[in-house]
Amino acid sequence: MAKKVQAYVKLQVAAGMANPSPPVGPALGQQGVNIMEFCKAFNARTESLEKGLPIPVVITVYADRSFTFVTKTPPAAVLLKKAVGIKSGSGKPNKDKVGTVTQEQLRQIAETKAADMTGATIETKMKSIAGTARSMGLIVEE
């Protein structure tokens, strides 16, 4: 028989840098999960990724306090900032533009995020990421 699910915990944790301090410790401690066990497993799974890149993770906690987790791809905004080389998006995206993103960069980001996105083709995923770029104050080259 399948295990009974107690809770789902959604977090964003820096790749290879999970530790028991907030936000990981309190979120998992409330559910009675062994925090160090999660940290070791998460760090092992994300060691191939760039250290410090925020990785969304969904942790399924079962009634017997065991857990499984699924890592997602980094948020599109983080990948866009990295591609353009900026620290943060624009505070006034309709007035102040902070950088330019090319179609090739959009394609690379769409291919990276393809598993976590809806959309039939890579072009529709590129349009979605272009919308994120515009809302951050980036100019999208045609």
UniProtKB/Swiss-Prot annotation:
Keywords: Methylation, Ribonucleoprotein, Ribosomal protein, RNA-binding, rRNA-binding. It comes from the Bacteria. GO terms for molecular function: large ribosomal subunit rRNA binding; structural constituent of ribosome. One or more lysine residues are methylated. GO terms for biological process: translation. One of its GO terms (cellular component) is cytosolic large ribosomal subunit. Pfam families: Ribosomal_L11, Ribosomal_L11_N. InterPro entries: Ribosomal_uL11 (IPR000911), Ribosomal_uL11_bac-typ (IPR006519), Ribosomal_uL11_C (IPR020783), Ribosomal_uL11_C_sf (IPR036769), Ribosomal_uL11_N (IPR020784), Ribosomal_uL11_N_sf (IPR036796). CDD domains: Ribosomal_L11. Forms part of the ribosomal stalk which helps the ribosome interact with GTP-bound translation factors. Belongs to the universal ribosomal protein uL11 family. Part of the ribosomal stalk of the 50S ribosomal subunit. Interacts with L10 and the large rRNA to form the base of the stalk. L10 forms an elongated spine to which L12 dimers bind in a sequential fashion forming a multimeric L10(L12)X complex. NCBIfam families: L11_bact (TIGR01632). This is Large ribosomal subunit protein uL11. It comes from Haemophilus ducreyi (strain 35000HP / ATCC 700724).
